[in-house]
Amino acid sequence: MQLDPSKFVAEGLTYDDVLLLPAYSEVLPREVNTSTFLTRNIRLNIPIISAAMDTVTEAGLAIALAQAGGIGMLHKNMTIQAQADEVRKVKRSESGMIQEPVTLLEDALLADAFNIMKENGIGGIPVIDADHKLKGIITNRDLRFQKDMTVAVSDVMTKTNLVVAPQGTTLTEAAAILQGNKIEKLPVVNKDGVLVGLITYKDIQKVKNFPNACKDEYGRLRVGAAVGVAADNIDRVTALVNAGVDVVTVDTAHGHSKGVIDMVKAVKALYPHLQVIAGNIATAEAAIALADAGADAVKVGIGPGSICTTRIIAGVGVPQLYAVYECAKALEGRGIPVIADGGIKQTGDMVKAIAAGASSIMAGSLFAGVEESPGETIIYEGRKFKSYRGMGSIEAMAKGSKDRYFQDETDVVTKLVPEGIVGRVPFKGNMAEVVYQYIGGLRAGMHYCGAASIEELQKAKFVRITAAGMRESHPHDITITKEAPNYTR
């Protein structure tokens, strides 16, 4: 047997192995620009993405994160229709003008109106005829004292003195109309009276309340969704596109594989304008292969996550900081962003990931404990926790993530080889507070490095440290009596 003398490629470093060197600075933390590219064509206002995990990201968390300036990736452990519906919930949750509002025909019953309002969490529905011309509007106030729910909506709706706005009305003009007429919903019609949209007072207020929100060209919150490489995933992509998804991520444990490359090519061939993220990878060769296949961003991380056991079970992986650097270096000049997925334990880890070349970070455990995550709330020994599991756990694979680990050939749970575990994380409160602290840490790091933008932070230098250096970096020789909101060991 002839052993390759270059078998040991390099010494891999991760976040706890380094610190960033401080540099001359002319910017204060509040002055830095935290916007970044998620993909070639999508820009985020903060470099944070929530992981496509079934205890992390569904519509509720995706809405909250997009309002903060990031983006959520909806997990795929659900039916195609259910995932598309989650996309619609996000896209309808906030809009400059709702492009395709929920409507009813004139002969619909009050029971239909009641059920649709309850299902979609809305307080009013435009009523149209067969030609899509606006005939009236019915609100929850119209239903409040109705006993006979078999009455047609046309008998109860507001149809006279209906306040509408012409196509092309700005949000500022719409706000004046809404306030002047003391109404909450403003149908928008074209010159033929056809309904083309709906502007609500609630949406205008959200624009004021969340000025940093990540939105598409129509003023809707952005959202992404995971797809796999199984046979039905082109159908899944089609359903997601029809629902208005902004970006899909071809989500597997080993992105440098034929199935992933073929899926990226297939999706880009069908939907050339759809932004596609591909992963997960950990080498320069993988980054180049996915970029050549047409990926608009690559996701880096094999085994760094707190609930991942891939490195232990399979013996495979690359320390995360080194992996991010290698992939970013390989794609330099190609305009394809790198996403650092996993291993973020402290706010400083995010700063280090970006300095190593990432344009954004993806996190699961960071968000698993927040109010908006879909994980089960658990009370244990008087403390509040939320459930959190890896998509490589047996429980998650049994629910649909088998193809992420290329084990979709079996339906026998006992034949699955897990690469993740199930656990719980402390409850953290609402997501906005967690994101505020993380972005605060990022701003501080940028200030120390003299970086006014994410692009400038990527030029920062590292110093390698010892285990003693890391111990020195943490609070030491003291008993903490009052915990800080942004620090834990």
Residue ranges and their predicted role:
Residues R30, T79-R88, Q146-T150, V194-C214, ...:
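Active-site-adjacent beta->alpha loops and helix N-cap segments on the catalytic face
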Residues R30-L44, A51-M53, A82-N120, V127-D129, ...:
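Bateman/CBS regulatory modules and CBS-like beta-alpha motifs in cytosolic regions of diverse proteins
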Residues R43-I48, G96-P101, D216-A226, V267-A282, ...:
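Short beta-strand/loop segments at the ligand-binding rim of alpha/beta enzyme cores
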Residues G60-I63, D235-A243, A282-V300, A340, ...:
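Catalytic cores of alpha/beta
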Residues Q67-A82, V245-S257, D296-A314, I344-I378:
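Glycine-rich phosphate-binding active-site loops on the catalytic face of alpha/beta enzymes
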Residues L74-N77, T103-L104, G124-P126, V164-P166, ...:
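Catalytic beta/alpha-barrel core
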